[in-house]
């Protein structure tokens, strides 16, 4: 992996982390198209640079993270299902992260669900439930929705937003809670990956991680503002159509003999 690769992946991550189109799926596709080797470092890189994007949430929403123990407890409860399920199925997830075909099907199925949800929950206006209205039981449900996103291509933000909508949150509140839940989730995922590779990581690879995280952070700052504005005005339907088209294009390329698998 070169610095140019790290910058491109950082841009891809920053743009896609908070959109319901799967940042991991897009990075797997981008890595495949650039011919980046499918190594343990590459897989770790694709997870760790997500923390760079997540840091933008702390900057943009810092007031929400001031001492507010009820808020922290709900975030922790929502995080637990993902942590537990992730630990149990981590090897399966590692294997799936190398499959562009899995990403393609996840994009298509997720796109169909997004389009359905945009219509089914269109009645939820700004009067919907707020984050402070969530119960601990609601938090567990949101955590279970997030756990589904361990399948590459599903989209963590898309899954948690969907969970928020089913609980009666409006689109803006559901999207913002998805941002907040990303902080402990990706912090834990980053720590786990660092512990796995810290003994073998080389100085040059550390620099690649820093570059990727920095780029993802800056780009994500812009993407969050864009996403909230789009969702508030137009909903999720456009993202759903995008997912379906991208997934179909990938499948067509695969089934016509184009090798998109990581090398």
UniProtKB/Swiss-Prot annotation:
Note the superkingdom of the native organism: Bacteria
UniProt entry tagged with the keyword Transmembrane helix: yes
Gene Ontology terms for molecular function: undecaprenyl-diphosphatase activity
Q: Write down the membrane topology.
A: Multi-pass membrane protein
Q: Name the InterPro entries on file.
A: UppP (IPR003824)
Instruction: Supply the alphabetized keyword list.
Output: Antibiotic resistance, Cell inner membrane, Cell membrane, Cell shape, Cell wall biogenesis/degradation, Hydrolase, Membrane, Peptidoglycan synthesis, Transmembrane, Transmembrane helix
One short Pfam name that applies is BacA
Q: Which residues form a coiled coil?
A: none
Q: Which E.C. number(s) belong to this protein?
A: 3.6.1.27
Where in or outside the cell?
Answer: Cell inner membrane
The UniProt entry's GO biological process terms, in alphabetical order, are: cell wall organization; peptidoglycan biosynthetic process; regulation of cell shape; response to antibiotic
What are its GO cellular component terms?
Answer: plasma membrane
Task: Name the reaction it catalyses.
Answer: di-trans,octa-cis-undecaprenyl diphosphate + H2O = di-trans,octa-cis-undecaprenyl phosphate + phosphate + H(+)
Q: Which residues cross the membrane?
A: 1-21, 41-61, 69-89, 96-116, 147-167, 177-197, 208-228, 238-258
Q: What else is known?
A: Bacitracin is thought to be involved in the inhibition of peptidoglycan synthesis by sequestering undecaprenyl diphosphate, thereby reducing the pool of lipid carrier available.
Family note = Belongs to the UppP family.
Give the protein's function: Catalyzes the dephosphorylation of undecaprenyl diphosphate (UPP). Confers resistance to bacitracin.
Q: Which HAMAP family match?
A: Undec_diphosphatase
- NCBIfam families documented for this protein: PRK00281.1-2, PRK00281.1-4, undec_PP_bacA
What name does UniProt use for this protein? Answer: Undecaprenyl-diphosphatase
Organism annotation: Bdellovibrio bacteriovorus (strain ATCC 15356 / DSM 50701 / NCIMB 9529 / HD100)
């Amino acid at each position: 992996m070169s610095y140019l690769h790290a910058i491109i992946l950082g841009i891809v991550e920053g743009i896609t982390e908070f959109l319901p189109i799967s940042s991991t799926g897009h990075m797997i596709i981008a890595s495949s198209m650039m011919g980046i080797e499918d190594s343990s470092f590459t897989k770790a890189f694709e997870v760790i640079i997500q923390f760079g994007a997540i840091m933008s949430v702390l900057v943009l929403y810092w007031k929400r993270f001031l001492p507010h123990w009820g808020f922290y407890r709900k975030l922790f409860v929502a995080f637990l299902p993902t942590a537990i399920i992730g630990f149990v199925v981590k090897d399966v997830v590692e294997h799936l992260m190398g499959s562009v075909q899995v990403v393609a099907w996840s994009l298509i199925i997720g796109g169909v669900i997004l389009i359905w949800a945009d219509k089914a929950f269109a009645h939820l206006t700004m009067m919907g439930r707020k984050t402070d209205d969530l119960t601990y039981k609601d938090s567990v449900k949101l955590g279970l929705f997030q756990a589904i996103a361990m399948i590459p291509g599903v989209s963590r933000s898309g899954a948690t937003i969907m969970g928020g909508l089913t609980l009666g949150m409006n689109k803006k509140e559901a999207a913002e809670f998805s941002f907040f839940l990303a902080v402990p989730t990706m912090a834990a995922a980053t720590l786990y990956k660092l512990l796995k590779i810290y003994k073998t990581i080389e100085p040059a690879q550390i620099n690649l991680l820093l570059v990727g995280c920095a780029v993802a952070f800056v780009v994500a700052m812009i993407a969050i503002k864009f996403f909230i504005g789009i969702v508030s005005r137009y909903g999720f339907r456009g993202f759903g159509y995008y997912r379906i088209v991208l997934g179909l294009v990938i499948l067509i390329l695969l089934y016509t003999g184009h090798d998109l698998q990581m090398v």
